[in-house]
Regions:
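Aromatic/His-enriched, Gly/Pro-containing loop or helix-boundary segments
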Residues: 1-2, 117-125
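Noncatalytic modules at the cell exterior or secretory-pathway interfaces
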Residues: 2-13
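Active-site acid/base region of carbohydrate-active enzymes
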Residues: 7, 17-50, 56, 63-80, ...
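Hydrophobic alpha-helical segments typical of transmembrane helices
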Residues: 97, 136-137
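Short coil/turn linking the two alpha-helices of tandem helical-hairpin repeats
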Residues: 141-142, 217
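Short, intrinsically disordered, charge-balanced linker/junction segments flanking boundaries
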Residues: 207, 214-217
Length: 217
């Protein structure tokens, strides 16, 4: 885990340092950025720069989630990674990221929700996180037209879909999980329960299950 900080305390100095005595360095995975963006609206330029800085800080050999509080390797960001491909042309990084998730899959076929896993015992699998793995592989194939991606990951994706069907479904509906749609537009996240009062969990779980089946087919 990488802990976010707002303030730093420095100990052991004999003299009071000035601001010029301190240096901060941004550390992240090496990037190959394609193109740039600028316009006459400085607000848009600032938003673009802040978003790009945030995305860079999220790359630590894998995609980090929630930089402001718990930067773990939740798999969910993988489901939207395709939106980064056109700007961050890093096929080896993205492939390594997908391989990490594949290698962390369990013998029963389940895909963990966090890769690398939390220290100690991994948590139970969750469709809303594990399903991002298949989506990442599929988006990479579409972006780079590399059939070997499908060959490398097909069996693991199939095992994951079979696991959902066997252990998490009642008929065609996914009924087992713990995360849900907790980012309702205009409302604060449901921190205490991680699910929306407006979206049934089974709806989002089953939609992701269906998406994984389409990818597998």
């Amino acid at each position: 885990i990488y802990h976010p900080v707002q303030y730093l305390q420095i100990k052991g100095l004999t003299n009071k340092p000035s601001i010029d005595d301190l240096q901060g360095r941004i550390v992240h995975t090496d990037e190959n950025l394609e193109g740039d963006f600028s316009c006459s609206n400085e607000l848009f330029n600032t938003i673009h720069n802040n978003v790009n800085r945030t995305l860079s800080n999220s790359l630590k050999g894998f995609l980090l989630d929630c930089l402001h509080r718990e930067p773990y390797g939740y798999n969910e960001p993988a489901s939207i990674a395709a939106s980064l491909f056109t700007r961050k042309h890093m096929p080896l990084f993205w492939r390594k990221y997908a391989t990490d998730i594949r290698l962390a899959a369990r013998e029963d076929g389940s895909v963990g929700d966090v890769v690398p896993a939390f220290p100690g015992k991994p948590r139970d699998p969750d469709v809303s996180q594990g399903s991002a793995y298949a989506m990442l592989v599929w988006y990479l194939y579409q972006a780079y037209d590399d059939r070997s991606l499908l060959e490398e990951h097909y069996e693991t994706i199939k095992d994951w879909v079979d696991y959902i069907k066997k252990y998490m479904c009642e008929g065609p509906i996914v009924t087992v999980g713990w995360l849900g749609d907790h980012m309702v537009p205009g409302k604060a996240p449901g921190y205490e329960k991680w699910r929306s009062d407006e979206t049934p969990q089974s709806l989002s779980w089953t939609a992701l299950y269906y998406r994984n089946i389409l990818i597998l087919s």
